[in-house]
Amino acid sequence: MANGDSPDQNENHCSAINSSILLTPGSLPTLTLSGKIRVTVTFFLFLLSTIFNTSFLLKLQNWTQRKEKRKKLSKMKVLLKHLTLANLLETLIVMPLDGMWNITVQWYAGELLCKVLSYLKLFSMYAPAFMMVVISLDRSLAITRPLAVKSNSKLGQFMIGLAWLLSSIFAGPQLYIFGMIHLADDSGQTEGFSQCVTHCSFPQWWHQAFYNFFTFSCLFIIPLLIMLICNAKIIFTLTRVLHQDPHKLQLNQSKNNIPQARLRTLKMTVAFATSFTVCWTPYYVLGIWYWFDPDMVNRVSDPVNHFFFLFAFLNPCFDPLIYGYFSL
């Protein structure tokens, strides 16, 4: 490295994306028992998520066909359709990639696929997170500013398009920073070891720290804050309305009135936020810990490490159950 960074700093930012392994010559990774369990659980969740999300898409399609041809899907069902597509994309890209990578341990697919799959992986993680933000914003506006939403029928389509666009743009740096490295075992037991990593792609160590923090913020912190704020506004608005007219509480027994629909919306958005928080918090806690202390890999047991990473794969499995229960 042609800079003034210390060796420790260089080591920190020349790390592998697959954070479950540590690449150091002479100590090359192997597929452990806990790794085999992780692979098994990963492919099991892959099957569950694929079945759940595909089933919901088919249910939406059948629901549409039963309606009159002149009617379109409601705005909420359009949003749920795009969230399902985003979850399905994450399922079909991230889970098989993680499972196969843990089986092979090293990277055999070459430089091009290293870059392309790294891009698709992050893109498929951005998309569902941003789509959850769109749903939260749309439901919040529908309750707090219903007239403004009705007067701007294209707002939902704009937010959906923006979510997909930002996902593709924010994942773009992956095409540049990821590449192949080749390591040799000091013991001479292996002829070579290839891995797809961000090895020394950043001029200085803090550049990677900034990129990691930006990615973490866009994938987790910002979406979570927006969902919490939107839910708080929905609760505040409904509480104020019911306080002004307590008799509306009795109307909630009917399935054909606005208060009941609003309460169902509140329950669904809260369930989304809860699932998002529960599933992704362990994953990012481990990731942040690794950013600030790469040696934590040697202190945290291998089973705990794999267990925390598996939490993230639960989210695309839970989402179709949530919106299937509350919307259809």
Swiss-Prot record:
Cellular-component GO terms for this entry: plasma membrane
PANTHER family, alphabetized: GONADOTROPIN-RELEASING HORMONE RECEPTOR, NEUROPEPTIDE RECEPTOR-RELATED G-PROTEIN COUPLED RECEPTOR
Disulphides: C114-C196
Oxidoreductase found in the keyword field: no
Gene this chain is encoded by: GNRHR
Protein's recorded name: Gonadotropin-releasing hormone receptor
Positions in the Extracellular compartment: 1-38, 98-115, 185-212, 301-306
Subcellular locations according to the entry: Cell membrane
Main location: membrane
Membrane topology: Multi-pass membrane protein
InterPro entries, A to Z: GPCR_Rhodpsn (IPR000276), GPCR_Rhodpsn_7TM (IPR017452), GphnRH_fam_rcpt (IPR001658)
Family assignment from sequence similarity: Belongs to the G-protein coupled receptor 1 family.
Residues that span the membrane, as ranges: 39-58, 78-97, 116-137, 165-184, 213-232, 282-300, 307-326
Any Pfam family hit: 7tm_1
Regions of this protein lying in the Cytoplasmic compartment: 59-77, 138-164, 233-281, 327-328
UniProt-recorded Gene Ontology molecular function terms: gonadotropin-releasing hormone receptor activity; peptide binding
Function: Receptor for gonadotropin releasing hormone (GnRH) that mediates the action of GnRH to stimulate the secretion of the gonadotropic hormones luteinizing hormone (LH) and follicle-stimulating hormone (FSH). This receptor mediates its action by association with G-proteins that activate a phosphatidylinositol-calcium second messenger system.
Keyword annotations: Cell membrane, Disulfide bond, G-protein coupled receptor, Glycoprotein, Membrane, Receptor, Transducer, Transmembrane, Transmembrane helix
Keyword set includes Cell inner membrane: no
Glycosylated sites: N18, N102
